[in-house]
Amino acid sequence: MIFKKPIKHKGFTLVEMAIVLVIFGFVLSALLLPLRAQREQAAQAQTINTLENAREALLGFAQANGRLPCPATAASNGIASPNPSGACTIQQGFFPAATLGIQPINSQGFAVDAWNNPIRYAVTLVDNPNGVVSGLPTGYGVRNVPDFTSFNEIQDIGISRTNPAPPLNVPALNPDLKVSCGQVATPECTPANLIINNAVAVIYSTGANGGLLDSEVGADEVANKNATTLFYSRTQTAKGSTAGEFDDLVVWISPYVLYNAMIQAGQLH
């Protein structure tokens, strides 16, 4: 009787399989990290483009209407929200995407960033404190309404006039939105040195972490969401950094950019 030698099937041992899986994990991680970074960069680029389009739309609105629009409220479905007198109901709210025709929007009518968070918008509500501006005809520049969001107020007051009462020698049109590099001093930032101290509008995205609670993000991000006239724009930092986590993307409109656009459209002389 002939006995056949059993055939030995060669295969991976458990140890060898474990080693292969570990190596595969390292390779996969090395591939995913650049992919994640590329996606984040693409999202930021898309959001910056949305913010720039929003800024251009605001300038176009001012060219057509002689003023800036009010922010949208949480209940206005993306429509600018003035009260019956024409004054804005809020200073900071959501970008009025329905009024300005900006895309993309969500189901509530809010313009959104690449992370589907609503774009925020603030506008100066400053009103010339002196009432009558020197040299203006009776009935002009005396309305007790915000200068930059009220019909014809920018044109009525004009860009060349100065306050007739203290503070003297400052423009009668004097927007008050400010942007700082942060609340915490760093090698890159001295908080007292403002990036701009007279913006007419600020538009910003709350970034990838925009859906988190205030307790989960940095102080500068919390301050932006609660701001009326002072906002923060700086280099992005991770959680645990000296200045705190920050990934907001912020743009603004200088009054001189607004004036130039309105002059070109014949809305300002």
Residue ranges and their predicted role:
Residues 1-8:
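N-terminal secretory signal peptides that target proteins for export/translocation
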Residues 8-39:
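N-terminal single-pass transmembrane signal-anchor helix
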Residues 37-269:
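N-terminal pilin/flagellin-like segments and related low-complexity appendage regions
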